[in-house]
Amino acid sequence: METSPSPRHSAPWWALLIVGFLCGLLIPMACGNASGPTVPAEADGTPSQQPQWTAPYVPAEMVFADEKVDLRRSDLHERMDRELITFTYGHTLTMLMLKRANRFFPIVEPILREEGIPDDLKYLMVIESNLVPTIKSPAGAMGLWQFMPATGREMGLEVNANIDERCHVEKATRAACRYLRKLHAQCGDWMTVCASYNAGPAGIASRSQTQKADNALDLLLVEETSRYMFRVMACKQIFEHPRLYGFHLAASDLYPYIAPAETVTVTATIDDLPTFARDHGCSFAQLIEANPWLRETSLQNKSGRTYKILIPDTAALNYDPTRTSAYHREWVE
């Protein structure tokens, strides 16, 4: 026998329609707020923990080595923009270079000044080596200034298995000054010198003649050299305005320049440098860090040449943030 459904178990059609409408409205709202209310990250006074990506500032013009560079032209602006983005967001290496500069610029800047080389050329050294005095390229270039063996010898450096003065900060810098002067005599301006340092003077001269270009920035070059000139300028821009690009350091964050305790003049062979180091109150590792041009555990000197070996001040090697000062005030807050 058929029976009709009870009114208590059946809802009118309009009630079902209302329930469906409310579910369609409320469920997305609930899901959308699952992570909390949409309020500004700093509304409660705490700093935002989310990364913030902003486009780095690109100046309209720069002065590099006393030569004005106009960056308002779109292609030059974009090339500079690329390198500033790379340095800004490749921040690990940029931060390390800023820290290391406090150790090496006190040695390098006075030499550039004495040799008559514009101070801005130190940034060429920064991008060549990231301020690691023993760094070696796959092609065999070595040291802060990345000399190839033949070029190093041509500029007066001793380069062999026992001694590699490309890693001697002072001697390599003076050799770099000689080489930069030679390039400037050939090129006539410092931006072309930078391009020639990377690609070789013959190649740049040939392209300048073929392309009938008066400015190295207007040359059609391989990407590495084309970027190289802007990397040097971008490095200068960030080193002179670090906070503008998000680098906030205190003086205690910088790596200090540690003057040697003494300098020992050597004119004979030293068969055992580890013993020599111990006799002078330091470890062999500390001796090599102070004299990275020494390549082995002995110093061979059959010709009686004069070498000056720096003896590190082991007491000064202890980290003391109160003793670290910034070589350039613009690096720190």
Q: Could you say what each language-model-derived stretch is?
A:
Residues 252-284, 305, 332-333:
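Primarily a LysM-type cell-wall glycan-binding module
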Residues 71-255, 294-300:
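Catalytic glycan-binding domains that act on GlcNAc-containing polysaccharides
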Residues 243-244, 276, 320-324:
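Short conserved micro-motifs at the rims of enzyme active sites and ligand-binding pockets
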Residues 2-3, 9-116:
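An acidic, Gly/Ser/Thr/Pro-rich helix-cap/linker signature
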Residues 237, 278-281, 285, 292-295:
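Hydrophobic alpha-helix feature that most strongly marks membrane-spanning transmembrane helices
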Residues 286-330:
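Extracellular LysM carbohydrate-binding repeats and other cell-envelope/extracellular binding modules
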Residues 175, 196, 279, 287-290:
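Generic alpha-helical secondary-structure signal
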Residues 236, 268, 313-315:
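Non-catalytic surface loops within mature trypsin-like serine protease
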